[in-house]
């Protein structure tokens, strides 16, 4: 069965205290939490990884993880795609003064054109001094 791991990585990390939380190392070797999650997903049989990111972090994201993960995925015949969450990409009008992304629902909506198989959503969350992740089935 074809399956997709949809990784929400566009958050602004306002509670995280600066920096891009998705790119923060979690061990001495510089791995980030997505490294482990993606490797596990490949072993579980996922065929596609889709990153939901913001356009303004695209280059840094690809430098830190994207290019490396693309090589790992290619070696296992897993495809990688990127979609961009944009605050203006919503049905209807943007409320005056809105500056933050719309969250989970709008992020998944941003990926609608590349989600052609059953998928699992992975969210990376911060809480005070730690980073956690959650899988939504």
Regions inferred by a protein language model and the residue ranges of each:
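Short beta-strand/turn micro-motifs composed of small residues
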Residues: 9, 27, 53, 123
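Conserved donor-nucleotide/metal-binding helix-loop-beta segment in metal-dependent transferases, i.e.
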Residues: 129-137
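Short, acidic Gly/Pro/Ser/Thr-rich loop/turn segments
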Residues: 13-15, 90, 129
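Conserved N-terminal catalytic core of the sugar/cofactor nucleotidyltransferase
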Residues: 3-4, 31-121
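Short acidic, glycine/proline-rich loop/turn micro-motifs
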Residues: 18-21, 93-95
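Short, glycine-rich nucleotide/cofactor-binding loops
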Residues: 24-31
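N-terminal nucleotide-binding beta1-loop-alpha1 segment
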Residues: 1-19
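The conserved acidic donor/metal-binding loop of glycosyltransferases
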Residues: 125-127
